[in-house]
Amino acid sequence: MSFFQENWLLILVAFVSGAMLVWPLVQKRFSPMKELGTLGVTHLVNHQDALLLDVRETKEYEGGRLPNAVHVPLSQLEARAGELARHAARPVIAYCATGARSRMAGAALAKAGFKDIYNLNGGIRAWKDAGLPVEKATT
């Protein structure tokens, strides 16, 4: 018992460290989104007519996008979810610059009734790093 009393801070740090290691796994398990790499994205687009959803802000979008992507910034996603309703039966692949904002988009898409939701792991940066095509947005 004296070990625990003398080393309570060390035990607390060990517990918190362990929780921080496990948390991403728990979060991923209960997320409405599935993660995909660039190969998985190209497969879904080519074989299942997946919708590419760019959730970056307009300035970022204007710098380049994935071919045929639909642009709805994350900040407007809940308000504009009705515009995407006609695509609810299709797989939806959300992406942003690195994959962080598109993960947040998953909850809004699930709330809007989408069932088959994916995140491009690494975002458009991973797409470009893989040498895949990017097109300039038309204004």
Give the location of each predicted region.
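Rhodanese-like catalytic fold shared by cysteine-dependent sulfurtransferases
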Residues: 1-40, 44-50, 58-91, 102-139
